[in-house]
From Swiss-Prot:
Gene field: atpE
GO CC annotation: plasma membrane; proton-transporting two-sector ATPase complex, catalytic domain
Protein location: Cell membrane
Name this protein carries in UniProt: A-type ATP synthase subunit E
Gene Ontology molecular function, alphabetical: ATP binding; proton-transporting ATP synthase activity, rotational mechanism; proton-transporting ATPase activity, rotational mechanism
Predominant place of localization: membrane
Topology versus the membrane: Peripheral membrane protein
Assembly behavior: Has multiple subunits with at least A(3), B(3), C, D, E, F, H, I and proteolipid K(x).
Function: Component of the A-type ATP synthase that produces ATP from ADP in the presence of a proton gradient across the membrane.
Protein's UniProt keywords contain Plastid: no
Keywords: ATP synthesis, Cell membrane, Hydrogen ion transport, Ion transport, Membrane, Transport
Organism: Methanococcus maripaludis (strain DSM 14266 / JCM 13030 / NBRC 101832 / S2 / LL)
């Protein structure tokens, strides 16, 4: 729930920057091919006296090398684009707790974490600032909602403040089950799908 919203939101925010980088890469590819065609044409004329067959072979070799070089360059720029986009996503991730809808995202991550461990007596771990967002009345409402959904008594007790960007960590009282829905852990778990989504959007 919350994880999908996070990844979709920050990928969308980074899209414009990545498209610009890709456009530059495509322009460079065209420049490589154009230069190669000009070089091939010049060499073809220079060796024309040696025979038409030799000239054609030289031209084809130059063009093949140019296409290979252009393809390699495009692949390098594609990976560069993905890496730069991921860096932008990480920057946006740090800023996410400052956004107006962050509390809604946090609540969804908490609910997802409670589902993951199956309810019951739980410990809720947040960073210091997020503990201020989740007051006692909000905590009580969450407990009631989860009890109704899981058909199981659920108690959320605030634990110690953690050094995380945002999101939450949910633990069962006996420590046997842990759901790490911190923003950084959520991002890391979804990294492969984020990369695939970036590639799909841009290429």
């Amino acid at each position: 729930m919350g994880a999908e919203k996070i990844t979709s939101k920050i990928v969308e925010d980074a899209n414009k920057n990545a498209e610009k980088i890709l456009a530059e890469a495509l322009n460079e590819k065209e420049a490589i091919l154009t230069e190669a065609k000009e070089e091939a044409s010049k060499k073809e004329q220079a060796i024309a006296k040696k025979g038409e067959k030799d000239a054609e072979m030289t031209k084809n070799r130059i063009l093949a090398e140019a296409r290979l070089s252009a393809k390699k360059k495009l692949l390098e720029e594609r990976e560069k684009t993905i890496q730069l986009t991921l860096e932008k996503l990480e920057e946006d991730l740090v800023k996410l707790p400052q956004k107006e809808d962050y509390k809604d995202i946090l609540l969804k991550l908490i609910i997802s974490g409670v589902y993951s461990v199956g309810g019951g007596e739980l410990e809720l771990l947040l960073n210091k600032k997020d503990f201020e967002l989740i007051d006692d009345s909000t905590l009580w409402a969450l407990e009631k909602e989860m009890e109704d959904r899981l058909k199981k008594v659920t108690v959320l007790k605030k634990g110690e403040a953690k050094s995380i960007i945002g999101g939450c960590i949910i633990k069962t009282a006996d420590q046997t089950k842990v759901s790490d829905n911190s923003l950084e852990a959520t991002f890391e778990r979804n990294l492969d799908s984020v990369r695939a989504k970036i590639a799909e959007m841009l290429f």
